[in-house]
Amino acid sequence: MALTDLTIHELQALLKNREISSRELTQAFLTRIADTDQRIGAFITQSEEAALKNAEAADARLAAGNAASLTGIPLALKDIFITEGMRTTCASRILDNFVPPYSGTAVRKLQEQDAVILGKLNMDEFAMGSSNENSAFGTVKNPWNQDCVPGGSSGGSAACVAARQAVATLGTDTGGSIRQPASHCGVVGLKPTYGRVSRYGVIAYASSLDQVGPLTRDVEDCALMLGAVAGYDPADSTSINTPVPDYQAALKQGIQGLKIGLPKEYFIEGLDTDIRQTIDKAIATLRKLGAEPVEVSLPHTEYAVACYYLIATAEASSNLARYDGVRYGERVDQGRGLIDMYMQSRAAGFGPEVKRRIMLGTYALSSGYYDAYYLKAQKVRTLIRQDFLDAFNQVDVILTPVAPTPAFRMGEKTADPLQMYLSDIFTIPVNLAGTCGMSVPCGFSHDGLPIGLQLIGRPFGEETILRTAYAYEQATDWHRHCAPL
């Protein structure tokens, strides 16, 4: 088995025992990127020289016997994370030349453990998209079928792991942007509870919804990565000051007697046949492992997409007001005055989907429509959160599909934004509720595309969904399948 096929927990032992060096491991991944990324397009910026230098520093720490859990492990980051000295674009022309003077908290935590950062990954521009077709740096291709999308907005993060270009990656999830691409690319992806991981140093899309999370080969790596980045951060006012559990220790507790909720609103007519059959088989497997499936109701699910696209776009219109060509980013200097320069810089710098969402959000916040749209959406959000809290009075975990279909073909939905928005119908409610959810590989469609199982936990219930996912993963081998690159 190639080094690039191994997980973090497998590589830890090899590094600790000095059977391999971090430099050797890092070079193997850099070679893999060189061999595959012309076909996939997962990377926006590679950091080969710095990665090899950091790998040598990690080797010194390993030799001294004081390694941390990620020392010497090659990782990659969605290009939404601020990284000191490394270009950060958010897949937008307007930030094409932006090199930040500092690193965000999640990145710094990885660096403090001597993880090796290979580079920055492609995404939908400003995390706005469900297919990774909205990047100024080209479309990412699904490693399982390069005619299909990898999902979005963390499409590069999922494709990178599936293509064995890094051991694991960090992404962000605002309405499904970790879980949906994880499902489409056949990897594990977890969106933590809002406030569990610091957002400091993450370029904001929708501040009340954005959350940082890992994408990995298997559940154990996911638990390890979450533990590495989770925790209170005084630099983020939304960070929650609660202890971080030992997520790895919780994995092997089993799921005997665990009640798993099946929301009737998610298992409806029109759900793709392959998705339905695969999810039904996963439910049967969990039942054999001792879990008890229970039907529950999340009655306000049907309003989630409309609610999300009012709240998220309203927050985006405010967050993206800072990109004016003056303080950082691209500037168009042909304007006839300051206001004209603002307008031309933003017109040239933002892509069409970002412009669409800024306009939607500005409209929702306008004085004549604030109460009718934005305020009403916030009230619906409260109802959706209460639906989940009520359901968790009956069950320990909620199980649903991640997406209504497997990965779709490139260009299939670009002409119909509403159809694209509906791709996230099963993931958006988790963000609105502020709770945690993850995608675990659970099978393939009839044409060989991966399918993910979504496990949703109560707020700060990451331990429970991780041990449920681990029990399922140990009973199956879906996570061992490799994309045919």
Curated annotation (Swiss-Prot):
**Catalytic site residues?**
78, 153, 177
- Which PROSITE patterns would you find in this protein's record? AMIDASES
What enzyme category does the UniProt record give?
Answer: ligase
Recorded superkingdom = Bacteria
Q: Which SUPFAM superfamilies match?
A: Amidase signature (AS) enzymes (SSF75304)
Q: Which InterPro entries match?
A: Amidase, Amidase_CS, Amidase_dom, AS_sf, GatA
Q: Which Pfam families match?
A: Amidase
Annotated keywords? ATP-binding, Ligase, Nucleotide-binding, Protein biosynthesis
What Enzyme Commission number(s) does the record list for this chain? 6.3.5.7
> What's one GO-annotated cellular component?
glutamyl-tRNA(Gln) amidotransferase complex
Q: Name one GO biological process term.
A: translation
Q: Which reaction does it catalyse?
A: L-glutamyl-tRNA(Gln) + L-glutamine + ATP + H2O = L-glutaminyl-tRNA(Gln) + L-glutamate + ADP + phosphate + H(+)
Q: Which GO terms describe its molecular function?
A: ATP binding; glutaminyl-tRNA synthase (glutamine-hydrolyzing) activity
Spell out the NCBIfam families in the cross-references.
gatA
HAMAP family to which the protein is assigned, alphabetical = GatA
Q: What does it do?
A: Allows the formation of correctly charged Gln-tRNA(Gln) through the transamidation of misacylated Glu-tRNA(Gln) in organisms which lack glutaminyl-tRNA synthetase. The reaction takes place in the presence of glutamine and ATP through an activated gamma-phospho-Glu-tRNA(Gln).
Regarding protein family, the annotation reads:
Belongs to the amidase family. GatA subfamily.
Subunit architecture: Heterotrimer of A, B and C subunits.
Its protein name is: Glutamyl-tRNA(Gln) amidotransferase subunit A
